Structures are given as C-alpha cells and as structure tokens.
Regions:
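Extracytoplasmic/secreted envelope proteins and their assembly/folding machinery
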Residues: 92, 96-100, 106, 183-186, ...
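Surface-exposed short loop/turn segments
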Residues: 25-47, 101, 106-155, 172
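A structural "domain/chain start" motif
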Residues: 24-91, 200-212
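Generic short beta-strand segments
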Residues: 59, 128-132, 165-167
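Envelope-exposed proteins and targeting segments
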Residues: 50-52, 66-68, 75, 83, ...
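C-terminal motif of bacterial Sec signal peptides marking the signal peptidase cleavage site
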Residues: 19-22
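Short secondary-structure boundary motifs at beta->alpha junctions and helix caps
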Residues: 78-86, 155-195
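Bacterial N-terminal signal peptides that target proteins for export
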Residues: 1-13
Length: 212
C-alpha cells in the first residue's frame, strides 16, 4: 500500500531543497585580521597646564581612506588594500584618536575633547588626511602619512595651518610589519603635530587672552 503524498509535505521538501541550494551558492565571507594602530609608550611631561581647551576633530579624507581597509599603492597610481586584514576603525578615526591620546599623555593640555562630543573649546585641531597608506618603491616599501593640519579658534577662524608628512621604511612586506610601520609613522607625525599645536595655540591665546 502506498502512502498518499500530501501537498503540504511536497511544499516543505521543495522549500528545503531551495534553501540548501541558496546556501551553496552564497559566497563565504572572507575572514579578516583586525589591527589596532600600534603606539610606543610615552612619558607625560611635567609642565604648567595650558589655560585653553582643545577639541580634536576627525580629519576629512577621500572615500578610499575613510574606511577600515589598510591601503597600499603597489605601483603607479593604483590604490589597493591588503587582503584579509583591516583596521579597527577608519584611518581618520585612528589618527584622531592617536592625537587625542597623545595630548592626554603629554599633559600640557588638560581640557581636551573630540568632535564626537561636540563640546565647546577655545581651539579645534582638524584638517585633511591626504595619505595613510603603504607604498612600494621598487623592491622597497614604506608607510606614508600626510596630514594638512589646521588649527581654528572658537569662531572658526583659522589660526594656523601646516602640512605634516612622514615616510617610514618597512623592512618586511608582511602585513604585521606594515602595521608596525604605520605605528612608528603615526608616533612621529603625532609628536610633530602636538608640539606645533601647543606652540600655535599658546601664541594666539597669549595675544588674545580670554576672561581678562
């Protein structure tokens, strides 16, 4: 005796087969190693706190740099990224957070905020991130970070501007070595931007003091 085939049973079987087929044709997501931006430990300086406050803003950048991809220029004007690796945050956020942390560690500016909090401040450090990538020079490779920094007062008037550019050679082409190179280049650039910001803000604040 044959069992009658119920229409509902056939429908379930067809649905299951379709689901299995869909699963087989969907591409598997490629696993990625997520990297933080390395930093070297710094010692806070013993100095009189600055009488002014600072807001550190995320620098503007191109769509290519404003992503978690680790950018690389293998040749000419070709921009690519390392396969299976990415940053923990987009490059502009990484640099902003590195600068903010550097000011905290330095200790000379104690009233610090970021553009995420949107708090009022005497000065704002921002600008444009023009390069944050590794570049091949023949068989050699180096990390390049280029920041057009801009310091503005609380009326959004530009107080000072300057281009900072760092080239950090990388001995190994492995991603981990390249990431370490980004950390070294960021430390160098951060130290330069920090000192420049303190000098320019202090000079402007002394020339136009508030609450006096």
């Amino acid at each position: 005796m044959r069992l009658a085939s119920h229409p509902f049973t056939r429908l379930l079987m067809v649905s299951a087969l379709l689901a299995l087929g869909a699963c087989s044709i969907l591409p598997e997501q490629e696993p990625s190693d997520v990297y933080r931006l390395p930093t070297a430990a710094t010692i806070s300086k013993a100095a009189t706190p600055a009488p002014w406050s600072l807001r550190v803003a995320k620098p503007k950048s191109s769509e290519t740099l404003d992503s978690p991809r680790i950018a690389v220029i293998p040749q000419g004007d070709v921009i690519s990224s390392y396969k299976g690796a990415r940053w923990s945050d987009p490059a502009p956020v990484l640099l902003r957070n590195r600068l903010t942390d550097a000011f905290y560690r330095d200790g000379r500016v104690q009233s610090i905020s970021t553009d995420d909090s949107n708090l009022q401040a005497d000065f704002e450090l921002g600008g444009e991130l023009q390069a944050f990538q590794s570049e091949y020079r023949g068989k050699a490779i180096e990390v390049v970070i280029r920041l057009d920094a801009r310091l503005a007062d609380d009326r959004q008037r530009i107080v000072a501007s300057r281009r900072f550019e760092v080239h950090q050679p990388v001995a190994d082409k492995q991603v981990s070595a390249v990431v370490a190179g980004f950390g070294q280049a960021s430390d160098t650039l951060t130290a330069q931007v920090l000192q420049w910001t303190v000098d320019q803000a202090q000079r402007h604040y002394t020339a136009e003091p508030k609450n006096q």
